[in-house]
């Protein structure tokens, strides 16, 4: 046997043993025997790099190379499902499907696993790409990290799979792994993960795949897409996918009647507590792919599927005290400190009280027995008080009047429930919160910096605001606690690299109230530089797509503050991209000036976001709904029948991709 043949043999053996252990849960060899085979393969691959294969089992161990994720457009948009919490709405969904199809249909009921969504692409039986849901149009390429998940096959079994296809599913962190990870974080005095979903999502986005490999993520796959799929049945296709090596949930049922659907829901509403992974509902899908196509999509979700969410679990425990947290915007949040209680698979010690009105409405007293719920929320919340056991009335909980961090008198804006600390330039949590937001991945994305490092730099007087980051040198931070030469160099390198971050993300990084990622993009496309934005009036801001008076006034208030203007000037001096690059400004025309355009369907040549950019680049305006003022509809495949009917009724022109591209060329 040649070396190459031996390597191939070991790879096949290890792929099979991975499948036996992680998917079938039926190992045929011991862990030691598996490790010995893996070590033998690693040695041979190291000695013979000419036989390197990206899909080798050895690629699952992860790498400590730190790199940014690239964004990849989804071939098929990853839409979210419509949610329902009532059986009446499930009945309405069933009736809508029956009326629209006017023929027999089956509903496939599946567990709704509570993790992070993933889309896997396979070509010729090999995993070539793994992409997160992102915004539904495009997501992060996390292929290297996903390759560390043992239940996801790198190479498929058999040979009857399509040449190219996508399969989607949920990346999960089992309860046992989640609890062990939080015990480790607690021992290191690090912030705990709130739930397995956050832990799985956070792990998948780590830029060190060796750590990802150590976190023992799992995956269930639940939807197959592509041409030449085995059958017209969604359920049947998943059974075929299981034969190819995918981990498909056995907790599925094809239902012929609505009563069978409810039987499935009611059974798992009780039994889900015994599962080793988090679930939060049941997904209902029309089983026939042909019928799915006939039903089509709305702008946000498929008409052939719905998610029934389980009611939040609740528990009774004692309220010991109320503490207060100050966020980066100055919002003060009351937090209930409780006797530990088991809820939804985790031990709950704290719960949000949200604001003064909630506290007053609950008539809370220290020592009360309170009901705690945990639904989709990250932090549990108190929903009621058991006054029947209030024998000894403790001190009534009253919302504080002054900031717990800096002592400033709190204010409450008209029409808002929250109280705020107005001392935004000298209140420590606000300053640190603004810096943490500034360095975050979706903002300036500064590698090596995190909350602990920011806290240390702030305590030592090295930074007082975001602009101070750009004055730091390696000598300033070398030798600090857990800060060696390499760590110091990486942080300074990350800070310098952030100067290349585009205008829209710098706007988002400023932390202007109500200005999220989407609004920041709209602003960046509407002004050539920060000076134009600083000097914009209310009318100019309101005329920007998706910006109302509330956001516009927040922007005006931000730049009316002299401290903020000085900060922006210092960031500009530091070299940040507070302007649109020349290439962005070139190519603009007025070919679509004055036209309001609706985008609908799935596209081939560009993504929906790219078409929105093209519309704005040529002077047009993107609008979300059809009205008599709509100029035309840019339509791709699977345009919703409701939009089609409304466009026809109003006599609005429908334009395909080719016609649109010709129009703007």
Swiss-Prot record:
GO terms for biological process: DNA repair; DNA replication. It catalyses: NAD(+) + (deoxyribonucleotide)n-3'-hydroxyl + 5'-phospho-(deoxyribonucleotide)m = (deoxyribonucleotide)n+m + AMP + beta-nicotinamide D-nucleotide. The keyword Manganese applies. NAD(+) binds at residues 31-35, 80-81, 110, 133, 170, 285, 309. Residues 587-665 form the BRCT domain. Its EC number is 6.5.1.2. The keyword Disulfide bond does not apply. Keywords: DNA damage, DNA repair, DNA replication, Ligase, Magnesium, Manganese, Metal-binding, NAD, Zinc. One of its GO terms (molecular function) is DNA binding. InterPro entries: BRCT_dom, BRCT_dom_sf, DisA/LigA_HHH, DNA_ligase, DNA_ligase_CS, DNAligase_adenylation, DNAligase_N, Hlx-hairpin-Hlx_DNA-bd_motif. The active site is at residue 112. Zn(2+) binds at residues 403, 406, 421, 427. Its cofactor is Mg(2+); Mn(2+). It comes from the Bacteria. GO terms for cellular component: cytosol. HAMAP family: DNA_ligase_A. NCBIfam families: dnlj, PRK07956.1. Belongs to the NAD-dependent DNA ligase family. LigA subfamily. DNA ligase that catalyzes the formation of phosphodiester linkages between 5'-phosphoryl and 3'-hydroxyl groups in double-stranded DNA using NAD as a coenzyme and as the energy source for the reaction. It is essential for DNA replication and repair of damaged DNA. This is DNA ligase. It comes from Bacteroides fragilis (strain YCH46).
């Amino acid at each position: 046997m040649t070396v190459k043949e031996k390597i191939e043999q070991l790879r096949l053996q290890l792929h099979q043993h991975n499948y036996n252990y992680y998917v079938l849960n039926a190992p045929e060899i011991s862990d030691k025997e598996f490790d010995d085979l893996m070590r033998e393969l690693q040695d041979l691959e190291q000695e013979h790099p000419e036989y390197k294969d990206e899909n080798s089992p050895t690629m699952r161990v992860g790498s400590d190379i730190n790199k940014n994720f690239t964004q990849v457009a989804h071939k098929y948009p990853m839409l979210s499902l419509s949610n329902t919490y009532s059986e009446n709405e499930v009945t309405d969904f069933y009736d809508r499907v029956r009326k629209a199809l006017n023929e027999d249909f089956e509903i496939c009921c599946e567990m709704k696993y509570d993790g992070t969504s993933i889309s896997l692409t396979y070509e010729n039986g090999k995993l070539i790409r793994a992409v997160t849901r992102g915004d539904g149009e495009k997501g992060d390429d996390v292929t290297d990290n996903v390759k560390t998940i043992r239940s996801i096959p790198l190479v498929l079994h058999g040979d009857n799979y399509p040449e190219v296809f996508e399969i989607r599913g949920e990346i999960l962190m089992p309860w046992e792994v989640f609890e062990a990870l939080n015990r480790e974080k607690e021992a290191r005095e690090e912030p705990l993960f709130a739930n397995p979903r956050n832990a799985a999502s956070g792990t998948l986005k780590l830029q060190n795949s060796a750590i990802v490999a150590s976190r023992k993520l799992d995956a269930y796959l639940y939807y197959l897409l592509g041409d030449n799929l085995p059958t017209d049945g969604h359920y049947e296709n998943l059974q075929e996918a299981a034969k190819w090596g995918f981990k498909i949930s056995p907790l599925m049922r094809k239902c012929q009647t609505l009563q069978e659907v409810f039987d499935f829901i009611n059974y798992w509403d009780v039994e889900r507590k015994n599962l080793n992974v988090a679930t939060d509902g049941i997904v209902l899908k029309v089983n026939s792919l042909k019928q799915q196509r006939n039903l089509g999509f709305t702008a946000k979700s498929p008409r052939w599927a719905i998610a029934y969410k389980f009611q939040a679990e609740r528990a009774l425990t004692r309220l010991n005290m109320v503490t207060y947290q100050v966020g980066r915007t100055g919002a003060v949040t009351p937090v209930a400190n409780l006797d530990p209680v088991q809820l939804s698979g985790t031990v709950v010690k704290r719960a949000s009280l949200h604001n003064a009105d909630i506290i007053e409405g609950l008539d809370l007293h220290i020592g009360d027995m309170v009901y705690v719920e945990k639904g989709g929320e990250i932090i549990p919340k108190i929903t009621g008080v058991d006054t029947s056991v209030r024998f000894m009335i403790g001190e009534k909980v009253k919302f504080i009047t002054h900031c717990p961090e800096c002592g400033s008198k709190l204010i409450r804006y008209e029409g808002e429930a929250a109280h705020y600390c107005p001392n935004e330039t000298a209140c420590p949590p606000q300053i640190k919160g603004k810096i943490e937001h500034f360095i975050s991945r979706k903002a300036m994305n500064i590698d090596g910096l995190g909350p602990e490092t920011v806290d240390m730099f702030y305590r030592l007087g090295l930074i007082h605001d975001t602009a101070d980051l750009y004055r730091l040198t390696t000598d300033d931070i070398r030798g600090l606690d857990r800060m060696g030469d390499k760590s110091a160099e990486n942080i300074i390198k990350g800070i310098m690299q952030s100067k290349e971050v585009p205008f829209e993300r710098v706007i988002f990084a400023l932390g202007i109230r109500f200005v999220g990622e989407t609004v920041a993009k709209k602003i960046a496309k509407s002004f050539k530089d920060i000076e134009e934005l600083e000097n914009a009036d209310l009318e100019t801001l309101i005329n920007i797509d998706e910006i109302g008076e509330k956001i516009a006034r927040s922007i005006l208030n931000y730049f009316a503050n002299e401290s903020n203007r000085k900060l922006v000037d210092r960031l500009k001096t530091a070299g940040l991209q507070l302007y649109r690059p020349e290439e962005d400004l070139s190519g603009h025309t007025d070919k679509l000036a004055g036209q309001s355009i609706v985008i609908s369907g799935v596209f081939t040549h560009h993504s929906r976001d790219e078409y929105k950019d093209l519309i704005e680049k040529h002077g047009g305006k993107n609008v979300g709904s059809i009205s008599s003022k709509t100029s035309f509809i840019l339509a791709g495949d699977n345009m919703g029948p409701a939009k089609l009917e409304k466009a026809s009724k109003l006599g609005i022109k429908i334009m395909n991709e080719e016609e649109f591209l010709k129009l703007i060329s």
